[in-house]
Structures are given as structure tokens and as C-alpha cells.
Amino acid sequence: MSDLTSAASVLAAALAVGLAAIGPGIGQGTAAGQAVEGIARQPEAEGKIRGTLLLSLAFMEALTIYGLVVALVLLFANPFAG
């Protein structure tokens, strides 16, 4: 693998993980804040809100895991290296 390909792969892996974490991080913070607000307004709906929140957080976290998988592929099973 050439030095340029290796450097580009490391940079792309870092960008993949970093950018994949930004969106879900913002979304998870917003969702958790709205859930706390909803529970404060309707305490009797706490169980339903919490269940929906946890499911939503799991789906959001999956996006970050996809970014990590892309980064690992670029670092260890690089399709661009000859």
C-alpha cells in the first residue's frame, strides 16, 4: 500500500467516525431532553415515554456503529489498497 493511500485511509477513517457521531449525538441529546420534558408534563406516561426513548436511542446509536464499521474496513480491510 502506498503512503498516500495509507494516509488517505487513516484520514477517511477518522472523518467517518467523527462525522458519524455528530448527528446521532445531537439527536440523542434532543430526544432525551424532550423525553424529560414529556415526563415532567405527564408523569403517568413515564413508562411509555421511556420505552419509546430507549428504542429511538438504539436506532440513533446504530448510525454511529455504522460509521465505526466503515472506519474499521478502511483501516484493516482497505478495498483501495492493491
Swiss-Prot record:
Alphabetized InterPro entries for the sequence: ATP_synth_csu_bac/chlpt, ATP_synth_F0_csu, ATP_synth_F0_csu_DDCD_BS, ATP_synth_F0_csu_sf, ATPase_proteolipid_c-like_dom, F/V-ATP_Csub_sf
Domain of life where this protein originates: Bacteria
Under the subunit heading, UniProt states:
F-type ATPases have 2 components, F(1) - the catalytic core - and F(0) - the membrane proton channel. F(1) has five subunits: alpha(3), beta(3), gamma(1), delta(1), epsilon(1). F(0) has four main subunits: a(1), b(1), b'(1) and c(10-14). The alpha and beta chains form an alternating ring which encloses part of the gamma chain. F(1) is attached to F(0) by a central stalk formed by the gamma and epsilon chains, while a peripheral stalk is formed by the delta, b and b' chains.
Which species expresses this protein natively?
Synechococcus sp. (strain WH7803)
Pfam family of this protein, just one? ATP-synt_C
Q: Keywords on this record?
A: ATP synthesis, CF(0), Hydrogen ion transport, Ion transport, Lipid-binding, Membrane, Thylakoid, Transmembrane, Transmembrane helix, Transport
Listed under GO cellular component are:
plasma membrane-derived thylakoid membrane; proton-transporting ATP synthase complex; proton-transporting two-sector ATPase complex, proton-transporting domain
* Gene field: atpE
Chief location of this protein within or outside the cell:
membrane
Q: Which family does it belong to?
A: Belongs to the ATPase C chain family.
What job does the chain carry out? F(1)F(0) ATP synthase produces ATP from ADP in the presence of a proton or sodium gradient. F-type ATPases consist of two structural domains, F(1) containing the extramembraneous catalytic core and F(0) containing the membrane proton channel, linked together by a central stalk and a peripheral stalk. During catalysis, ATP synthesis in the catalytic domain of F(1) is coupled via a rotary mechanism of the central stalk subunits to proton translocation.
Membrane topology type? Multi-pass membrane protein
Look up keyword Iron and say if it applies.
no
Q: Hey, where's the site called Reversibly protonated during proton transport on this chain?
A: 61
The name this protein goes by in its record: ATP synthase subunit c
Say if the entry is tagged with keyword Transmembrane.
Answer: yes
